[in-house]
From Swiss-Prot:
Protein's job: This protein is located at the 30S-50S ribosomal subunit interface and may play a role in the structure and function of the aminoacyl-tRNA binding site.
Name of this chain's protein: Large ribosomal subunit protein bL19
Transmembrane segments: none
Gene Ontology biological process terms from the UniProt entry: translation
Coiled-coil annotated residue ranges, if any: none
Family membership noted in the UniProt record: Belongs to the bacterial ribosomal protein bL19 family.
Length: 122
């Protein structure tokens, strides 16, 4: 491990940010800190994770939602101080790492099958 990677690992440890495990296809609610004038509030952004980029301190994920019939995508830096929390609403069952094909789809064709928990063998 070179010096830059060590520094990034130390910075991640110093931030101490714990986010739940999520993957592309999952529906998440991201609480974002928004500054309006002199006050700060949390804004919820709910959508489907269409991409995840794992690059240590530079990790990011992209969330897509439908707003007034229009698709809206937003990319969040995983270790950003503006991301207050991430909550997983439902797990999606997909076979791709990047779900960019959802950009061209709306309605029923844009639905993602839910991943059900594994049944216990007994």
């Amino acid at each position: 491990m070179d010096l830059i990677q060590k520094l990034e690992q130390e910075e991640i440890a110093r931030l101490g940010k714990t986010l739940p495990e999520f993957a592309p296809g999952d529906t998440v609610v991201v609480q974002v800190k928004v500054k309006e004038g002199n006050r700060e509030r949390l804004q919820a952004y709910e959508g489907v994770v269409i991409a995840k980029r794992n690059r240590g301190l530079n990790s990011a994920f992209t969330v897509r939602k439908m707003s007034a019939g229009e698709g809206v995508e937003r990319t969040f830096q995983t270790y950003s101080p503006l991301v207050a929390s991430v909550e997983v609403k439902r797990r999606g069952d997909v076979r791709r790492a990047k779900l960019y094909y959802l950009r061209g789809r709306t309605g029923k064709s844009a639905r993602i099958k839910e991943k059900l928990p594994a049944r216990k063998q007994g």
